[in-house]
Amino acid sequence: MEEYDLYGVEDDFESQFASELEVLAELEDDVSSRPGPQRSQLRTKLSFEEAISAGDPIRSNANSKPTGDSNGEALACIDTSKSKKRDASCIDFEEDEFSDSIYEPPITPKHKRARIEAVKKLDFGRDEYAGNSTALSDDITPPPSPNHSPKKNERDSKFSSCEAFEVSDMAPLQVTPTESEQKRVLKRPPVLEDYINVTSTDGSRVYMALKEDNDGAQQKQGNLKWNSGQQLHLLGVPFSYLKEQVNDEHRRKVLEESQRLTEMLNSQINEEFGENDSEILENDDNAGEEDDEDEPSSHSLWVDRFTPRHYTELLSDDYTNRCLLKWLKLWDTVVFGKERVVRKPKAIVDPRANHFKNQKEQQSKFKTKAQITEEILEAELDHHNRPKNKVSLLCGPPGLGKTTLAHVIARHAGYNVVEMNASDDRSPEAFRTRIEAATQMKSVLGVDERPNCLIIDEIDGAPTVSINMLLSLVNRKDAKEAEGGTEATTGKKKKKEGGLLLRPIICICNDQYVPSLRQLRQQAFMLNFPQTMPSRLVQRLYEIAVKQGMKADTGALMALCEKTENDIRSCINTLQFLHGRGKKELNMRSVQTMRIGLKDQNKGLFSVWQEIFQLPKIQRKRIGQEVATNDLHLLLGSENDSLGMLAKPPLNAVAQRFHHILHLSTSTGEYEKLTMGLYDNFLNMKVKESNFSTVCLALDWLEFTDIVNSTIMHGQNFQLMRYLPFLPVAFHLLFAASNVPRIAYPSSHYEAQSKLNQMQNLLNAMVSEISPAIRTRVGPQSLVLDALCLLLDVLSPKLRPVNTQLFSTKEKQQLAELINTMLAYNLTYHQERTMEGQYVYKLDPNVEDVCRFPDLPVRKPLTYQTKQLIAREIELERMRRTEAFQQARNAGRDNTTAAAAVKTADPKGAKSAAKPAALNHEQRLENIMKKATFEEKPEKDFFGRQIVKKVAAPVTASANQEESVERRIGKAVGNSDVWFRFNEGVSNAVRRNIYIKDLL
């Protein structure tokens, strides 16, 4: 008989001896119903004796007796637990898989097994072998009845399962059927299934396949897992599982105690204040029932529960997600040691095909933000295999998912996320320590040994010193690249400061234009976070509402998104708040009337100016929507909501705009800058009236605001500040248009303020040097309004540009009066060089800018030679006056000294002739010589005794050396009328020959 004829022996044996097998099954039921020894459910491995006592005896057929060793003829059912799997049911050894001591029936000869047949091991079907199965009429008696009981049919179906063909030999299987499942024991490990191994006392090892628990009869154990690759525990369960059970029990007790204390406090508060609200009690009862069903979920925020865990769950912009992921993957070379993937060059396209597109690109000189971002991401790495920008800066409004995006992208790229908040600890030392610990250290013994990725949240709240410290860490160089110093000192310095930055840093901020981030913006990879798409956010909110049992239509969710400006965190918190209050349905009225969900954020000035000068988009009214109910609710108050809703009709579109701009301007707070922007831009808007009545009305509003602001500042009456936000509302109703306005930052106030400061400085410089006689009669205001314009006419006389020796008497007198006037008002001419390289004389201080408007025609100025002549004469006259003043002062001092000397010498009042005053140069030289000559004091020792020096006799001595050189020079100068002084050096001045007689 060929080998393929034996494929159906097992099935034929089962079908022919169905009645005998049924009797055996009934006997096995009696045996299995006997009580056995109790053991713990958590115990996963039994001894071999326990397996024998708990298992079923193996029978060869109905009349055969079990033979073999008493130590181990059969194996018991072993309960093990694995995640989402359980052990196979009670197993039964096959007779052909034990040793020779087990009885082997001579029913069918055991043929030699073929080499390897893929069909035998991999094809688990039975239909292919049904045709080849032949009944062995010589050895097997046909069953007495063709009818099969339900129990037998169930057993047939189980016997014909896939495990029936996993037996290696072709001998007939003698299986003890059970009520639940059929048992299998294998000699070799199965190929396509999980398994466990069992070794008997005689050294025989068998394998049991693991199957899923489809009926759910066995209780699943959550954290207890079976792994064939790990060693078995002596306790039967891992110690971590026992520890976790203790922690869960402790946590449950703490929660129960806190719940009990909360209920006790609430009851005391209700008794004290007498709050008996039936609705609140009903809501609390409903909430209590839900808490009993799902206790851990009630104590957690929905924002944390439904936060995205994977890249595909993100709600943010796809382009922003890809850019951040690309930048993070640039670190793979230095962090993970992976080579950078070279981007394939784009295919060459015929330039004639996109001629117009190329021409348009050539015309645009500036690159877009997308092009700049792509260039940064495609740039070459530095010689340390790091990207050009070592820090990434995510900036955008709060609640859009910036922190969530950074966490998800970092985990997706294979990093261990280390988060720190820059607003928690603002000290630079703590900031430095935490950054270095996150970027230069690694967990060695911890569970997560992945490289760290530092995420710094709210970095716009960090001081400038901390930002500078972060930049110094980012720009830190290697020891070989450090400039200056020896190699040893450089090594010590780098050892103290640390090494290079080899880990990515992601910074998150709300306002990128904070002064402290000015230096960081220049070196960081900037990513502006756009608003979330409303369609994505509405879909996610709908999924969350459905999971939590709330009913919400798309219109209400869209209105909630518009109210919160697509703030994900605010929307989810609003849903949780409403769900906690017991509301099971979210409609349009509840969204519009509730006071929650508003963002506590100030908009930028440009956004506010744009909303003031631009009409809002016309939106289609949704079903069930009532216009501006929230504004009406805020105006009427919270006491009589129903009466207020019935008393006044809904607001129209103009009233909506009124309240929206009023709320916007109130939340801004910067009234001065807002007013300046309105003043500089309202004349650029389109005016419908030809008589400019709107412009006049706007100027009246500006005047009113200026008066109110001045009253507030001068009188400290801050109650009037409530009227300042109405100016933007008036400008919106007067100048708002549908087109997008071109807003320019206000500069007129700054220019006027700088001009005023400049004029005040000119006047102060002029008045500070005016003679006291004039200053007492002329104030700054009267000088500007009355005197300066006429003074400029006085300073422009008609003089000939010739030498002063050629002036007539009248011209000399006119020049002298001009010089006296300019010196009296501290005015002169200074030479300056223009941008073209020419030299001009300008009035200093230039009071002409104070009293002359730039649009008025300039009077005929003086010529260059005339101004030069006037400037020279002013300098000479100033020197003469200074010298005369000094001489008068010195003469007065000498007279006072002489009078005091005479009074001391002649106390009786005798008059003596006054000594003539010495010349100026003589006084100077005498004073100089007096300072140069000094009396020598005798040298003394420590005890104050005079030291006598032995002077050596000079070799050659003359009588002329008795006096010192200084004294002889002083006498020579004092006794002569003319003296000379030699100046060593070179002079390029004009020289002429003179005689001594000209000097005398």
From Swiss-Prot:
Extract one GO BP annotation from the record: DNA replication
The principal localisation class reads nucleus
Q: Which GO terms describe its cellular component?
A: DNA replication factor C complex; nucleus
Question: Would I find Cell cycle among this entry's keywords?
Answer: yes
* Matches recorded under SUPFAM superfamilies: P-loop containing nucleoside triphosphate hydrolases
Q: Which compartments is it annotated to reside in?
A: Nucleus
Please state the span of the N-terminal signal peptide per the UniProt entry: none
The organism's place on the tree of life at top rank: Eukaryota
Q: Give binding positions for ATP.
A: G396, P397, P398, G399, L400, G401, K402, T403
Compositionally skewed regions (Polar residues) per UniProt: 60-70, 888-898
| Keywords in alphabetical order | ATP-binding, Cell cycle, DNA replication, DNA-binding, Nucleotide-binding, Nucleus
Q: Which InterPro entries match?
A: AAA+_ATPase, ATPase_AAA_core, CTF18-RFC_complex, DNA_replication_fac_RFC1_C, P-loop_NTPase, RFC_lid
Compositionally skewed regions (Acidic residues) per UniProt: 272-295
A GO MF term: ATP hydrolysis activity
Disordered: where is this region? 53-89, 130-159, 272-301, 888-916
Quaternary data: Component of the CTF18-RFC complex, which consists of ctf18, ctf8, dcc1, rfc2, rfc3, rfc4 and rfc5. The CTF18-RFC complex associates with pcna.
In the record, the note on similarity to other proteins reads: Belongs to the activator 1 small subunits family. CTF18 subfamily.
The record, for PANTHER family, names: P-LOOP CONTAINING NUCLEOSIDE TRIPHOSPHATE HYDROLASES SUPERFAMILY PROTEIN
Q: What does this protein do?
A: Chromosome cohesion factor involved in sister chromatid cohesion and fidelity of chromosome transmission. Component of one of the cell nuclear antigen loader complexes, CTF18-replication factor C (CTF18-RFC), which consists of ctf18, ctf8, dcc1, rfc2, rfc3, rfc4 and rfc5. The CTF18-RFC complex binds to single-stranded and primed DNAs and has weak ATPase activity that is stimulated by the presence of primed DNA, replication protein A (RPA) and by proliferating cell nuclear antigen (pcna). The CTF18-RFC complex catalyzes the ATP-dependent loading of pcna onto primed and gapped DNA.
Protein name from the UniProt record: Chromosome transmission fidelity protein 18 homolog
The species this protein belongs to is Xenopus laevis (African clawed frog)
> Gene behind this chain?
chtf18
